[in-house]
Amino acid sequence: MTTLPEKGEGIFGYKIMDRTTVSMLGAQITEFSHICSGARVLYIENDDRELGFNLIYRTPQLDQSDSNHILEHLMLCSCSRYPSRDIFFDMDSKSYSTFMNGLTDNTYTCYPVCSQSEDQLLKLMDVFLCCMEEPDALKEDYFFRREALRYELENEEDDLSLEGTVFNEDWGHLTDIQENADSFMAETLYESQTASHLLGRAHFHYKDISFKRIQERFKKFYRYSNCLIVLYGKMDVARILDFLDREHLSRFPAADCVDNDLLSYFHEPVNRGFFRCKGESPAYEGNPGNNNRIIDYGIDLSGCSEDDLVYWIW
């Protein structure tokens, strides 16, 4: 394994913030802060031959248009250095990756990729990072219309239809009674707050989707000072850190970024008291709905200690 400096020391433009051991993973954990860009790097160092890289951005759901999910689809379409119709599928079919994806959650968006070849991982990292920095999908709306929302007319006699990869994915959950129950729960616990917004609701809020809104989300979220980079496995981490610093991170100083206090979205005051909500979930005509019922009981755990959380989980 690579010998790294001690906590508080520096290497390749990074300062080591913390070092610890996680016996469950058989790993030494090192946390770095990149001085120029403000990015955080977490290296999980063990003997696993499977090498991993993950870009994680803090992306609170500011509304229910599923714009963060749309942006995730757009980011790995094409970029200035690697132009393509869909670079994600190019990489998937032409590289030695063992896992590759883009994932959107209610609080973050991440882009993991794995390979057993360090050289391949470096190349894939370069593609991912270039796409995060200069995505072609935000320069003109071709990719937006493909992945987000567009009108289609098959024949003159037909009605206009709404299409789009993310829109259709969300539409597929229209009658998902559990997802609709989750949405009612969030809206009841966190009325008028960011936490009430869940992903996957574009089919209900498609009028709020716009190319301009997607561009604004990119400027707000996609900067290295709002990014955690995770490295995993038995790798030449000095080589990786040098590559990240030289080719990418140092090109985007934190001082040049718009300062957005994204953490404030996760610390909004919680409505106190007991609330009750009754909601209805759509069902297709002919589907029996008499026995489809869900009763949820939710508790807000904001401000709980670690001991409290363990108690509630177990």
Each model region followed by its residue ranges:
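Short pre-active-site segment immediately N-terminal to the catalytic Zn-binding motif
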Residues: 56-66
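N- or domain-start disorder-to-order transition segments that initiate the globular core
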Residues: 1-48
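Generic recognition of long tandem-repeat/solenoid scaffolds
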Residues: 28-34, 111-113, 277, 295-297
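Short, conserved catalytic-motif segment at the N-terminal edge
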Residues: 49-53
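Short, low-order "capping/linker" segments at domain edges
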Residues: 269-286
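Catalytic glutamate of the conserved HExxH
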Residues: 66, 70, 74
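Charge-rich, well-structured scaffold segments of protease-associated domains
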Residues: 1-12, 60, 74-83, 87-269, ...
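Low-complexity, Gly/Ser/Pro- and Lys/Arg-enriched regions
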Residues: 19-21, 286, 303
